[in-house]
Amino acid sequence: MSLVRRSAIWPDFPFLFPFGSVIAAIIVASITRGRSGLKDFLSRCLRWRVGLKWYAAALLVPVALALVQVFLNVLSGAPMPTAAQLGPWFGVLLLFPDSFIDAPLGEESGWRGFALPRFSASRSPLTNTLILGALLAGWHLPLALVAPSVVAYLIGTVASAVLANWVYYNARESALLVILYHTASNTMGRYFFPMFSGADLVRMSWLFAAVYSLAAVVLILVNGPTLRRQPATQADTAQLPQPQIP
């Protein structure tokens, strides 16, 4: 996202780019439902009582997938990251706060905190997830254009949407947990991708798409079209009196 923010897009207010979706969500929620709309929006963004296992899933699944990507890249001929590149063990933790603010906080608050709950209930969570994934691919197109591989980036974006919504639906539809998932995923990308260059970097991009896609397929096969391990509770799936996305 930082590459886009340094480009000609929104040259006067580049810092607002990652917050476009949440700004739109706040405006629409205020206009359509007023205070109650904002309350519902904030409740999803701040929903933290979801069980420790889903915090672990949101934070550790991206780490595991990133390690698999690095392993496969090295196995395919890329040089092993050096000790200097890896740095101290806590170095990756220093990337987390900046990654949190740089995109996930603004994006997921808008997409999962506001937009996704208003998708049609007549479709399965998986179908809505794939629709959202396509929208997110379009949203991230400016960033994809400066990525090592445009196609790999967009495929990975859709696949990551499946993983993110798996967390979302199992964590009581908490946008907060998806924010953490997105932050962990971006942190891993910012940590490992700069360790490669040239053809190795392009291969790493395709491994990102392949590993995330494989993980998404496994989750779909295990959980089915609901993406849930257990049936959703009525409180988690209460429909909002808002216009639905067709």
Where are these regions (language model features)?
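Membrane-helix interface linkers and caps
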Residues: 2-57, 71-87, 167-173, 220-235
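C-terminal membrane module of polytopic membrane proteins
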Residues: 171-176, 180-246
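Membrane-interface helix caps and helix-loop-helix hairpins in membrane proteins
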Residues: 7-8, 78, 142-150, 195-202
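Aromatic-anchored segments of alpha-helical transmembrane domains
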Residues: 63-68, 133-143, 182-192
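Membrane-interface helix/loop boundary segments of multi-pass membrane proteins
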Residues: 106-131, 169-174
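Hydrophobic alpha-helical segments embedded in the membrane of multi-pass proteins
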Residues: 154-166
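Membrane-interface starts of transmembrane alpha-helices
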Residues: 9-20, 123-132, 174, 200-207
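Juxtamembrane helix-entry segments on the extracytoplasmic side of multipass membrane proteins
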Residues: 81-97, 145-156, 202, 206
